[in-house]
């Protein structure tokens, strides 16, 4: 057995172990049809990304699952990769070029792409290297990139297939337009920021009448594109105006007054201006009423030639001028100060403009149906289940997906326009000529695809699709997807309908959803708040294992969690506790044969039974994806039952070389520690590997050792009950000593009084534990109080009373006060149980065993209360 260092130094251990794992290729997986497959595809981080706490949680959860399944004998594959992040990367490259005094247009498309690829090569792998610091055990031989050759082939294949089936089309719709970046952006890239603004209340005169319609808008500049005014059809105030026309001020243009149920009668005046080219809801109203669409802005956010004297002005400058004119001409009623959520581009922070644009779209109605069915048929499951409702809500209300982006970095749309006949040819490769008229005068679409288009293919493109690879046959559908609730729509849904459409199967069996990590005040981490925490700094100061343990034990599936430094300190302390306990075991260890069970003591059987139960409970929790609960159970077992109780219990046997049960104690210490380390390994891979390799030096690594499973031969329930009773007694003695301020050095005579023969037997044969753990000078077990002075303090445990004659050490007034508190506590418990059993609803619905448990509690608490009352009466005499 190798000697273990005195202290655990993560900075030394982690790099050495990770290098060993990489050299030995423990993470690498080949198709093995003799084993059950288990596959996870990593949520690919952006190549522009730096590791943040969200990445750390997301990938820790995946690593836990993959390490567990690997140890459990599965053919476990974790596919890593990175996303090309079209707009983020393009912005980074543009910024770098700007520092050199260059623009995209200066170098042209090819020159820009050369620079983008060079940037990717230099910076794209940083975050993957950072994930190694976290201990991630991905198959690094299989790293994928959403623009690598295989993924690009999958993208082209998918686009062409969908186009041929009529699911991809080109049309005019409202999209999110960023005037700063001059591209369409997805809803996922729009962040809503609370800003001070105004409601401008404006009168629109009715043609042929003195009446006016009063309405309010936050964007007066868009009124130049108004093509109607709408009211609710059931609004009696305006029914007489439906079908008439009104005048749009400033333009003095006549537009119809239409009736549409979109209008909220209760909001404002119940009248809204309709600008189909600049509002998604107005666009839908425009479709229903066949209204013209007038776009009033250029791509850079300036007003276009359709806006008369405002042409060329920035939209915000035009707003001021329009409001000024409205005021001068008497149409402006009032300006109301408000705070409202403004959609901004999350990358450049510019306010986005809803604008009508000719773009490429995916028709979603038919594609959504299989994605709905696979969930309804329970072939696809969400953990927690409530997120399935969100999934269904999105699918039932899905709109066509805008997939074109006005960017150069990304998958270029494989559509070729004929300058002679106008036909569009869609092909995986440049066709060279128009498929309709044969003209060679064709040009490829300048736009690229939304980043999510390639991400939607990730579960199968990473396994080799569109080719029928062995990996695709063996590992698809993948086992579980781990992701945050924030991208259920933007990523999860798109992967599901893509998998169903292209492969005919769901992309994964389960979706494990986690929440966000917030600071200790519940706020999101952000640069503006200055509350960000760098995981790499945490790893440098604490090690990866404490960070992983803190993240996972603080996490309940689907819920946000808060980051507390105190919890991180506790996790580091746990590492030290586990290290010191292991070192203690190794210092006392001797090689020997496995002892026969007859040589095992009650304490040995108790801890074996406990670790056996632990293996079963951890397996159950992991199978339900309750990773935090599983980790907490192992943590509690190691800290409390193994370190604080069992090790202390066996010390007298270890220190006595003549003790006939010493070998059994050593064997048990080692066996339980090995099993505990294995159970903790998925959560804390580095320290468990280091300790395991010192204890079990005949094995190469804990990673491929056998996962602990429940063994019937380690089931000692009677011994569990026995030692648990002793623990309860010792704990109560310690509590009394602490309450009475009895110094640890003072030895106390402990009396155990019980009429129960079985209880007396347990305590009679456990005296050494009281001497070791409760600082007892002597332990006397008897049937009654004979010989025990009336001034002794006591504690009631089940079927026994523990007495300690502390007359010279104890303030009896305090003892009476303590017993009064205990009495109140027990009275509350009795009252609670009695009321519960008197509740007819509970009795009618609860299972029989639950009712029996409550009745047993009632009996137990009443007996304990009677003993406390008796003791109080004696002390008050």
Language-model-detected regions and their locations in the chain:
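Short acidic-hydrophobic surface loop/beta-edge motif
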Residues: 200-207, 244-249, 343-347, 416, ...
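Secondary-structure transition/capping motifs at alpha-helix termini
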Residues: 67-75, 96-109, 129, 133-138, ...
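Short, polar/flexible loop-turn hinges at active-site or ligand-entry regions and domain interfaces
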Residues: 99-114, 381-382, 536, 557-569, ...
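Structured ligand/cofactor/substrate-binding pocket environments in proteins
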Residues: 54-66, 73, 82-83, 151-154, ...
């Amino acid at each position: 057995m190798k000697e273990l260092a005195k202290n655990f130094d993560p900075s030394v251990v982690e790099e050495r172990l990770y290098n060993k794992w990489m050299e030995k290729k423990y993470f690498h997986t080949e198709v093995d049809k003799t084993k059950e497959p288990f596959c996870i595809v990593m949520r690919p981080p952006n190549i522009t990304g730096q590791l943040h706490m969200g990445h750390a949680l997301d990938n820790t959860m995946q690593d836990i699952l993959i390490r567990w399944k690997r140890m459990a004998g599965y053919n476990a594959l974790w596919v890593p990769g990175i996303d090309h992040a079209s707009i983020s990367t393009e912005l980074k490259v543009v910024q770098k070029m700007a520092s050199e005094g260059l623009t995209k247009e200066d170098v042209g498309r090819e020159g820009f792409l050369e620079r983008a690829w060079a940037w990717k090569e230099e910076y794209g792998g940083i975050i993957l290297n950072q994930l190694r610091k976290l201990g991630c055990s991905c198959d690094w031989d299989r790293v994928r990139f959403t623009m690598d050759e295989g993924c690009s082939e999958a993208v082209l294949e998918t686009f062409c297939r969908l186009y041929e089936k009529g699911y991809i089309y080109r049309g005019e719709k409202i999209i999110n337009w960023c005037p700063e970046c001059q591209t369409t952006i997805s809803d996922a890239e729009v962040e809503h920021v609370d800003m001070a603004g105004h409601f401008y209340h404006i009168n629109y005169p009715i043609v042929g009448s003195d009446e006016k319609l009063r309405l309010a808008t936050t964007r007066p500049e868009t009124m130049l594109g108004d093509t109607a005014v709408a009211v609710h059809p059931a609004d009696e105030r305006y029914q007489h105006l439906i079908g008439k026309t009104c005048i749009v001020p400033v333009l003095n243009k006549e537009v119809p007054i239409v009736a549409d149920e979109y209008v909220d009668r209760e909001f404002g005046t119940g009248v809204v201006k309709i600008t189909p080219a600049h509002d998604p809801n107005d666009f839908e109203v425009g479709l229903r009423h066949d209204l013209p669409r007038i776009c009033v802005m250029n791509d850079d956010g300036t007003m276009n030639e359709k806006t008369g004297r405002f042409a060329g002005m920035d939209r915000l400058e035009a707003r001021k001028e329009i409001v000024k004119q409205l005021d001068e001409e008497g149409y402006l009623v009032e300006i109301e100060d408000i705070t409202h959520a403004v959609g901004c581009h999350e990358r450049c922070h510019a306010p986005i403009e809803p604008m009508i644009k000719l773009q490429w779209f995916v028709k979603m109605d038919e594609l959504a149906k299989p994605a709905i069915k696979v969930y309804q048929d329970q072939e696809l499951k969400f953990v927690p289940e409530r997120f399935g409702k969100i999934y269904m809500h999105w699918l039932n209300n899905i709109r066509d997906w805008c997939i074109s982006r006005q960017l150069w970095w990304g998958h270029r749309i494989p559509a070729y326009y004929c300058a002679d006949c106008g036909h569009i040819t869609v092909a995986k490769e440049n066709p060279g000529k128009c498929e309709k008229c044969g003209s060679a005068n064709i040009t490829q679409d300048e736009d690229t695809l939304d980043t999510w288009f390639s991400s939607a293919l990730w579960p199968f493109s990473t396994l080799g699709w569109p080719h029928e690879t062995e990996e695709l046959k063996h590992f698809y559908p993948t086992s579980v997807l781990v992701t945050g609730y924030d991208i259920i729509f933007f990523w999860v849904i798109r992967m599901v309908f893509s998998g169903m459409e292209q492969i005919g199967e769901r992309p994964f069996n389960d979706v494990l959803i986690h929440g966000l990590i917030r600071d200790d005040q519940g706020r999101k981490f952000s640069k503006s708040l200055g509350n960000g925490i760098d995981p790499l700094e945490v790893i440098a100061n604490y090690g990866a294992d404490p960070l992983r343990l803190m993240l996972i034990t603080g996490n309940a599936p689907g819920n946000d969690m808060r980051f507390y430094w105190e919890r991180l300190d506790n996790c580091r302390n746990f590492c030290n506790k586990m290290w010191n306990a292991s070192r203690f075991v190794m210092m006392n260890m001797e090689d020997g044969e496995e002892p026969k069970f007859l040589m095992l003591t009650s304490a040995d059987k108790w801890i074996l039974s406990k670790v056996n139960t632990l293996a079963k409970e951890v397996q159950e929790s992991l199978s339900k994806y309750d990773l935090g609960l599983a980790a907490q159970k192992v943590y509690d077992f190691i800290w409390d039952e193994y370190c604080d109780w069992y090790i202390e219990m066996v010390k007298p046997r270890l220190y006595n070389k003549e003790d006939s049960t010493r070998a059994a104690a050593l064997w048990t210490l080692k066996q339980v520690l090995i099993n505990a380390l294995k159970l903790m390994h998925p959560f804390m891979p580095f320290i468990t590997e280091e300790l395991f390799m010192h204890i079990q030096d005949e094995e190469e690594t804990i990673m491929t050792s056998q996962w602990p499973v429940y063994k019937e031969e380690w089931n000692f329930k009677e011994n569990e009950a026995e030692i648990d009773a002793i623990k309860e007694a010792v704990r109560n003695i310690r509590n009394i000593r602490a309450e009475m301020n009895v110094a640890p050095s003072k030895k106390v005579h402990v009396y155990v009084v019980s009429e129960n023969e079985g209880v007396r037997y347990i305590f009679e044969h456990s005296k050494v534990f009281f001497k070791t753990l409760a600082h007892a000078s002597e332990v006397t077990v008897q049937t009654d109080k004979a010989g025990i002075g009336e001034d002794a303090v006591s504690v009631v445990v089940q079927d026994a009373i523990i007495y300690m004659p502390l007359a010279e050490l104890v303030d009896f007034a305090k003892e009476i006060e303590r017993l009064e508190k205990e009495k109140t506590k027990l009275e509350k418990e009795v009252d609670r149980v009695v009321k519960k059993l008197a509740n007819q609803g509970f009795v009618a619905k609860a299972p029989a065993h639950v009712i029996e448990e409550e009745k047993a509690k009632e009996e137990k608490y009443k007996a304990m209360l009677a003993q406390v009352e008796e003791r109080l009466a004696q002390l008050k005499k």
